[in-house]
């Protein structure tokens, strides 16, 4: 039974579609928007539309950006021999905040997960292989999460990349098993990078 009008119910439903937002939090957010000055709702709506219109994938690393190539790919002070492969754009943010890595990135936009119907061809693996063709990259660091999907993805990539003659390493497991990179602190991330080893 609905206790509020159609537009409010729709707003609650839309908030509830976001990850980590349950029905009660969605309701709380909706009523916060309703009880705030109109500028809050207008600013939120404008930001949502703007981000959907202006953000795209970098043609080199597949990270989300408003310019192509992205600022990281344009940075010539980075080590062009290193490529760190991560699952999501938020993992790039975590790595950059840790300030321990100065190579380039490749964002897969997910991990292989048969249970969720995510196959290798659903990820940006084709773009990764294309990137490795120029021969500049000497080491690929697999920084997929240390959960089942991340390990599956890392093993798949290691088997795919080994024949290309590139060194394939996996970040060390200072990252707790089953956790996501974005939640790791800077020191843990840096130690995991330093302790990486050959993989596959």
Curated annotation (Swiss-Prot):
Going by the UniProt record, its keywords in alphabetical order are: DNA damage, DNA recombination, DNA repair, Metal-binding, Zinc, Zinc-finger
Out of the domains of life, which is the source?
A: Bacteria
Entry keyword annotation includes DNA repair? yes
Every Toprim domain range? 81-176
For biological process, the GO terms are:
DNA recombination; DNA repair
* Entries under Pfam families matching the protein: RecR_C, RecR_HhH, RecR_ZnF, Toprim_4
Q: Where are the zinc fingers (C4-type)?
A: 58-73
Q: Which GO terms describe its molecular function?
A: DNA binding; zinc ion binding
Read off the PANTHER family from this record: RECOMBINATION PROTEIN RECR
Q: What does this protein do?
A: May play a role in DNA repair. It seems to be involved in an RecBC-independent recombinational process of DNA repair. It may act with RecF and RecO.
Family of the protein in this entry: Belongs to the RecR family.
Protein name, please? Recombination protein RecR
Tell me what organism the protein belongs to.
Answer: Desulforamulus reducens (strain ATCC BAA-1160 / DSM 100696 / MI-1)
Its organism's taxonomic lineage begins at: Bacteria, Bacillati, Bacillota, Clostridia, Eubacteriales
Which gene name belongs to this protein?
recR
């Amino acid at each position: 039974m609905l206790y509020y009008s159609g537009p409010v119910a729709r707003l609650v439903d839309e908030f509830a579609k976001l990850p980590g937002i349950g029905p009660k939090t969605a309701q709380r957010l909706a009523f916060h928007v309703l009880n705030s000055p109109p500028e809050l709702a207008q600013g939120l709506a404008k930001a949502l539309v703007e981000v959907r219109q202006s953000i795209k994938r970098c043609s080199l690393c597949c990270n989300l950006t408003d310019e192509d190539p992205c600022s990281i790919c344009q940075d010539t002070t980075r080590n062009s021999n290193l490529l760190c492969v991560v699952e999501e754009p938020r993992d790039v943010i975590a790595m950059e905040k840790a300030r321990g890595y100065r190579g380039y990135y490749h964002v897969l936009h997910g991990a292989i997960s048969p249970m969720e119907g995510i196959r290798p061809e659903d990820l940006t693996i084709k773009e990764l292989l294309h990137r490795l063709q120029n021969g500049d990259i000497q080491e690929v660091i697999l920084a997929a999460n240390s959960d089942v999907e991340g390990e599956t993805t890392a093993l798949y990539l290691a088997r795919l990349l080994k024949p290309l003659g590139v060194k394939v390493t996996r970040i060390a497991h200072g990252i707790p098993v089953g956790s996501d990179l974005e939640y790791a602190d800077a020191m843990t991330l840096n130690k995991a990078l330093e302790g990486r080893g050959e993989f596959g």
